[in-house]
Swiss-Prot record:
Gene3D superfamilies: 3.30.70.100. Substrate binds at Y18, Y41, W76, W77. Coiled coil: none annotated. This is L-rhamnose mutarotase. Pfam families: rhaM. The gene is rhaM. It comes from Enterobacter sp. (strain 638). Keywords: Carbohydrate metabolism, Cytoplasm, Isomerase, Rhamnose metabolism.
Amino acid sequence: MIRKAFVMQVNPDSHDEYERRHTPIWPELESVLKDHGAHHYAIYLDKARNLLFATVEIESEERWNAVAHTDVCQRWWKHMRDVMPSNPDNSPVSAELKEVFYLD
């Protein structure tokens, strides 16, 4: 498994709405993530900094990157763009983090 971590932001007035939309995520999005090899996906909210911290374990970079090209992911991004900073293609503005320590 490949461990990934990344950060995103949520609009200051959208914390509750962001959480509501993830409780739960759409079943078809969950299926696509699992079908593309995503495991142990978690998102944490730092309300003081409007920061989202996400971790996920993936089976391959290619399968993970393919999620972005699915219809359900495109619809999800469009659904979320009003609660978080987004790129022109509606994907969330995010930054991948480098792992510097891991204890198994």
